[in-house]
Amino acid sequence: MAVSVLRLTVVLGLLVLFLTCYADDKPDKPDDKPDDSGKDPKPDFPKFLSLLGTEIIENAVEFILRSMSRSTGFMEFDDNEGKHSSK
C-alpha cells in the first residue's frame, strides 16, 4: 500500500512539473513601453526547463514501468510456485 501511495505521489509531482514546464504563460506588455514587434526575444531558460522536465518525466515513466514489470514477474513466479506446491 505504501509503495502505491509513493508511486502516485511521484506521478502527481511529475505531472505538476510537466504542466508547469509546458505552461504557455506570456506576461502582459506594460502600456508605458513601446511595442517591439521587430525583435524576437529568445526564451532560452524556459526552453531549457521544458527539456529538463521532459527528460525527467521520460526517465521516471521508464523507471516506473520497469519496476512494475519486475514486480509483476515476481508475482507470476509466486503464483507458479503456489500451483506446484498444491499438487
Curated annotation (Swiss-Prot):
Alphabetically ordered keywords of this record: Secreted, Signal
Gene Ontology CC: extracellular exosome
Cellular localization per UniProt: Secreted
Alphabetized Pfam families for the sequence: DUF4576
Keyword Secreted on entry: yes
Disordered: annotated span: 24-44
Signal peptide (from-to): 1-23
Principal localisation: secreted
Name the record gives this protein: Uncharacterized protein C5orf46
Organism, scientific name: Homo sapiens
Chain's gene name: C5orf46
